[in-house]
A protein has these predicted regions:
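Sparse, context-dependent recognition of short Cys/His-centered cofactor- or disulfide-binding micro-motifs
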Residues: 11, 15-19, 93, 101, ...
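Active-site helix/loop of acyl-thioester processing domains in fatty-acid/polyketide metabolism
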Residues: 1-39, 123-125, 131-152
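Acidic/His-leaning functional-site neighborhoods
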Residues: 110-181
């Protein structure tokens, strides 16, 4: 299976979770690891939830991808959801540096965001408004497709990305930095 189809299958599996449990939480981090050769050669990957871990601040939700005849998972996907807080927190924006190697990442249309929600079954209202937030999984999928030879991606989200924002990214020597309008949206460590 190609990386596009695998990320879509994981996104669809995520929508099977009891969303009411995680209402108001937001994605802080995503880690995706694959046994690249095995995952690409597979005709079908079966996704299962791993053991959910929780503390006072977050949920850690694993999804494991299995191929028939192979004992260990060929993919491991972990999403860290940050629990909502009773305290009002002001968003601390992180200014993007000036990058000589900056290039366009993507400008997601509202229709792309709505379409991704429809295709995966995601009914989170923040992705369905007039000014929708771009799904973390959609950002992950776009980065994975744009990057050759991916076996691991770790994404840390800094602030929401919105439809119609001209997203740029640049390599800072360690991570790819996703930014728009002078502010960091996320960082991607890709191996």
């Amino acid at each position: 299976m190609n990386i596009y189809d695998r990320i879509m299958a994981i996104g669809t599996k995520m929508t099977e979770m009891d969303a009411s449990t995680y209402q108001g939480a937001f994605i802080g981090k995503i880690s995706y690891m694959a046994e690249k050769e095995q995952a690409e050669q597979a005709d079908n990957i079966s996704y299962q939830f791993g053991e959910v871990k929780e503390n006072a601040f977050m949920y850690i939700l694993p999804i494991l991808g299995y191929v028939e005849g192979i004992e260990n998972p060929v993919e491991k996907f972990t999403v860290t959801l940050v629990k909502p807080s009773d305290k009002e927190k002001e968003l601390k924006r992180v200014a993007a540096a000036s990058y000589e190697n900056a290039e366009p990442f993507h400008t997601f249309s509202k229709e792309e965001v709505y379409g991704f929600s429809k295709e995966t079954g995601d009914q989170n209202k923040i992705h369905l408004t007039e000014h929708p937030v771009v799904q973390g999984m959609l950002l992950l999928r776009t980065a994975a497709v744009q990057t050759a030879d991916v076996s691991r991606i770790d994404v840390k989200f800094v602030e929401p990305s919105y439809a119609e924002e001209a997203l740029m990214w640049a390599f800072d020597g360690r991570d790819y930095v996703l930014f728009a309008d002078g502010y960091v949206k996320a960082t991607f460590r890709i191996k």
